[in-house]
């Protein structure tokens, strides 16, 4: 599903597009308004996720611009130790930031055709890919574990109010220290 505009945002976008007429958008507001109307019209898309295996090498594919963090999640948990993640295969559904990225903002989190999938899309796509990797390998995914190495210890010694381990696999979580 796409993150479609609410009625207030849609009304604003439609009014702005009516005023604009047939000319190309002149500014970011007009471009954003055009994107909101497009998301409203499309509502949803089909995201094709695939996995294949060649010997002991696994390949997971997504039709999105997959973040490095997502690729690392897939590689870390893949049942096969040699795993590649290919993006923009069989489609171009735009950026899929992990849910925690939405809290940080940025152009890749704006609801538009190039990043309009719902906020939960990344964990759902990741889970689908892992399930497919299990199917093609005939093995269960590997479990991950947090390390307690010197870098982690130095963070704790600094006495942060909260910290983010950057190894969480299913969404945003700040841990009180």
Where do the language-model regions lie?
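Non-catalytic substrate/cofactor recognition surfaces at enzyme active-site rims
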Residues: 1-150
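Loop/turn elements at helix/coil->beta-strand transitions in domains of secreted/extracellular proteins
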Residues: 80-83, 158-162
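Glycine-centered flexibility sites
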Residues: 91-94, 159, 171
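Secreted glycan hydrolases and related glycan-binding modules that recognize and/or cleave
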Residues: 150-151, 170
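N-terminal helix-cap/turn-to-beta initiation motif at the start of protein domains
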Residues: 152-158
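Short, tryptophan-glycine- and acidic/Ser/Thr-enriched carbohydrate-recognition patches
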Residues: 165-177
